[in-house]
Amino acid sequence: MLTTFVIAPERPDHPEVTALLAELDRYLASLYPPEANHILDLHALAAPEVSFYAARLDGRLAGCAAVRRQSGEAATQGEAYGEVKRMMVRPDCRGRGIGASLLRTLERRLREQRIGLALLETGRTQHEAVRLYEAAGYRPREAFGGYPDNGLSAFYAKRLDLSAQGEAAA
């Protein structure tokens, strides 16, 4: 049976989304101590500087992701950046390209806003996530944004092409 997925902006307080985020929180809590979980709550996800997206597979919520625009800081030499947050694809929906498509959607949103740097923090033991980010061109970097370098987190960066040609190719 052919299945299709659609990615679109979504309200983070939608009941299906809050249930998925609660599932993600439980998963992260099973892997890391509370001080190593850097979770944006629903209030923060609804902020104007956050773009939140949901992926639906045959109408069912399959995943979500957000990007938060940040002003520059010392860790980025004053450059504005977008931080990938709350990225998740349900385990039974993986292997269909949903995660990669969500990531491309976030990158496209940053390009629309003329932001050429995407950063993220993920857990070192989340091997599927690390593989996804590295396959998408993200490279290891030092901690940023006040995150502690605690040995549990991995930090990644990707330069985004802001030229008209780069935007069309994305």
Task: Describe every region a protein language model picked out.
Residues 2-85, 90-91, 103-105, 109, ...:
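Acetyl-CoA-dependent GNAT
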Residues 102, 126-129:
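Conserved short alpha-helix immediately C-terminal to the canonical SAM/SAH-binding motif I
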